[in-house]
UniProtKB/Swiss-Prot annotation:
Gene Ontology terms: cellular component: outer membrane-bounded periplasmic space
Keyword Amino-acid biosynthesis assigned: no
Entry's localization field: Periplasm
Gene designation per UniProt: mdoD
Lineage: Bacteria, Pseudomonadati, Pseudomonadota, Gammaproteobacteria, Enterobacterales
UniProt similarity note: Belongs to the OpgD/OpgG family.
Source organism of this protein record: Shigella flexneri
Stated name of the protein: Glucans biosynthesis protein D
Highest taxon listed in the record's lineage: Bacteria
MF-aspect GO terms: carbohydrate binding; catalytic activity
Any single Pfam family the record assigns to this protein: MdoG
Record PTM text: Predicted to be exported by the Tat system. The position of the signal peptide cleavage has not been experimentally proven.
Length: 551
């Protein structure tokens, strides 16, 4: 699968996509910022100019694959690439008084073949100068790079950038843009996790997926003492161009990004993904198939959370299915959605390399009216933690035609917890396992005679305690099969309630079973809605095998 090869490369931060055709547009611009490393011609720049660039670029043909890299860069191993360090003494804002933020650039090489141009902007005068590549900006250490091949390659460009925050101004970055239109940020743990993208195209269609590139960035010079910076980006691909403005707030416990984009379609697009995010789910409390390791859980995110336009909150636990699955959840002007990592307990992961208990959640908050569309969720089978296998995005209902223009505004929260949560009872965890026996007899002296699958969903918060004396009723809807042995159990350690039921098949079908449940008290909903997709085994696997040897 092309997507899998791309994502595997991105684990080494590699992205192989098409080149930009903006050189003539830059040369036609009239473009200075006070920066020791900016050495290009002075040019005028603001967001309206960038929008015009993107609009005009969409009227021209996409130039296709990137040009070849010098051999010394093209053949690098991930280990060699990672040993290249940017010289912190030549950072973008090194000379800013009382700087709280600083920026460094990533070197081209390995899978990073797309030239990305960098510009420094004086926000007061709207003048910019390009920062050209030169080997003296980097420390090559033991990377084995033949720097003679790089002499005179001022147009080589960079692969991306990252931003550091005081007091870790040259040691631990908090924001990173690297590869295609991928970018990431951290919370106060400094632990990277899932990624966002500028745009997704044809993620789940009969066409080959397209990965647009950010091909140029313009940085407003950061103000003394500021923890907020603004960077502009030009996006380019075979089907679309875009002008992006990122206002990024590097707060104490989270990073917040205000994003504004203006998109210009070159071609008809079957599936346009707005504010896409990419994560990894190998196994968790609900999905144990790939957990034959010392780690109880392995995932960057454990659920998709949605706050629908009608006010309903939905929790959709993630899966690692045996077959690729794509689900689309319709909505009208969504209030927010995101891939969340809410389980922060180290003992639930036992991982001192990945530190999954520290990985951030990502929440999207639309800032203008997005209209009708769907939240798409793609879950790809994976054998482990080295491949991102979860994709989520907003797809507008209206088909995209060549020449169409769009504008979206949204806010991204990179934090341990989303900025908002359901005021009703919330899903804490989902567990699945063998069914068909009374709780407390697991499974008893012998296996159950009839096969079933048990589901246990824990709810916490809201007004559960007040509702309990009046009666809590789980409302369960299944696309196939039957729910039996339904129990409501109070769980003192979490001060919440567990809804437990066994699913029994009513046919031999192995089609996914869509499950939906919420809690009701005297006719009123008192919880968010739990959605789940279960994949029944083949009929000949619906039996328990007693493999004990008693003699």
């Amino acid at each position: 699968m092309d997507r899998r090869r791309f994502i595997k490369g991105s684990m080494a931060m590699a992205a192989v996509c098409g080149t930009s055709g903006i050189a003539s547009l830059f040369s036609q611009a009239a473009f200075a910022a006070d920066s020791d490393i900016a050495d290009g011609q002075t040019q005028r720049f603001d967001f309206s100019i960038l929008q015009s660039m993107a609009h005009d670029l969409a009227q021209t043909a996409w130039r296709g694959a990137p040009r070849p890299l010098p051999d010394t860069l093209a053949t690098m191993t991930p280990q060699a690439y990672n040993s290249i360090q940017y010289d912190a003494e030549k950072s973008l804002w090194h000379n800013v008084e009382n700087r709280q933020l600083d920026a460094q650039f990533f070197h081209m090489g390995m899978g990073f073949r797309r030239r990305v141009r960098m510009f420094s902007v004086d926000p007061a005068t709207h003048l910019a100068r390009e920062i050209h590549f030169r080997p003296e900006l980097f420390k090559y250490n033991d990377a084995g790079v033949d720097t003679k091949q790089l002499e005179g390659q001022s147009d080589l460009g960079f692969a991306g950038f990252r931003v550091f925050k005081a007091p870790e101004l040259a040691r631990r970055d908090v924001v990173s843009f690297l590869g295609a239109s991928y970018f990431r940020a951290v919370d106060d743990t400094y632990q990277y996790g899932l990624s966002a993208r500028g745009l997704a195209i044809d993620t789940y269609t009969d066409s080959k997926e397209e990965f647009p590139d950010f091909t140029a960035f313009w940085f407003d010079t950061v103000k003394p003492g500021a923890t907020t910076f603004t960077v502009y980006a030009l996006l380019d691909s075979a089907s679309i161009t875009g002008a992006y403005k990122f206002t990024i707030h590097c707060e104490k416990s989270q990073v917040i990004m205000d994003v504004e984009n203006h998109l210009y379609a070159r071609k008809d697009i079957k599936q346009l993904g707005i504010s896409p995010m990419t994560s990894m789910f190998s196994c968790g409390t609900n999905e144990r198939r790939m957990c034959d390791t010392i780690h109880p859980q392995i995932h960057d995110s454990d659920r998709l959370s949605m706050w629908r336009g009608n006010g309903e909150w939905i929790c959709r636990p993630l899966n690692n299915p045996q077959k690729l699955q794509f689900n689309a959840y319709t909505d009208n002007n969504p209030k927010g959605f995101g891939l969340l990592q809410l389980d922060r307990d180290f003992s639930h992961y036992q991982d001192i390399m990945g530190w999954y208990n520290k990985r951030p959640s990502l929440w999207v908050e639309p800032r203008n009216k997005w209209g009708k569309g769907t939240i798409g969720l793609m879950e790809i089978p994976t054998t482990g933690e080295t491949l991102d296998n979860i994709v989520c995005f907003w797809q507008p209902e209206k088909a995209v035609k060549a020449g169409d223009e769009f504008a979206f505004q949204y806010r991204l929260y990179w934090s341990a917890q989303p900025p908002v949560h359901c005021p009703l009872a919330r899903v804490m965890a989902t567990r699945t396992g063998m069914g068909g026996f009374p709780e407390g007899w697991a499974p008893g002296e012998h296996y159950p005679e009839k096969w079933a699958r048990r589901f246990a969903v824990d709810f916490v918060g809201g007004d559960l305690k007040a509702a309990a004396p009046k009666g809590i009723e789980p409302v369960i809807t299944l696309s196939s099969g039957e729910a039996k042995q339904i129990e409501i159990l109070y769980i003192e350690p979490i001060d919440g309630y567990r809804i437990q039921f066994d699913w029994y098949p009513t046919s031999d079908s192995t089609d996914p079973v869509d499950m939906r449940m919420y809690l009701r008290c005297q006719g009123d909903a008192i919880s968010e809605t739990w959605l789940y997709q279960y994949f029944p085994p083949a009929p000949d696997k619906r039996q328990y095998v007693d493999d004990r040897v008693m003699s």
